[in-house]
Amino acid sequence: DWTEWLIKERQKNLDKSRKSSLWYHQPMQKDIQAYHLALVKEDSVICDALFTQITRALPEAEYKIWHRHPVWFLEGNPIVGYHKLKDCVRLLFWSGQSFEEKGLDKEGSFKAAEARYTSVKEIDAKDLARWLKKSRDIQWDYKNIVKRKGKLERVK
């Protein structure tokens, strides 16, 4: 299958360049690999860096492609994810407005907050680690938002 071949070929090249990289990570699921492979190189590098830091900081989280983008969940509740926008990669924390952190901007009408990146150099590892810790500790119940007819309740 073409996707399998493309993943293997790209992985060979990426493995060579990542061996010495700060962002080197464990193998990712094939659907997330395919998501990264569909991006231009610069955006793929940003997503690789985010993937690595998120999986290291939240090893207990389940992650998968959800609504066509990589998303991490704790006990079924979406916590963090990223996706390609027209001019950047957006990192989204579902409960991020409650973190009260500089560098995260309000997104939408619920509790989400975002950071946007156009280069991997813009990712501040210390800020990201702090935000990821808060994403575990501060959560709004998005898992049951439909059941509660759009009303969010704090779970942590």
Q: Which stretches of residues belong to each language-model region?
A:
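Tryptophan (W) side chains
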Residues: 2-5, 23
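Charge-dense, helix-prone N-terminal extensions
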Residues: 15-156
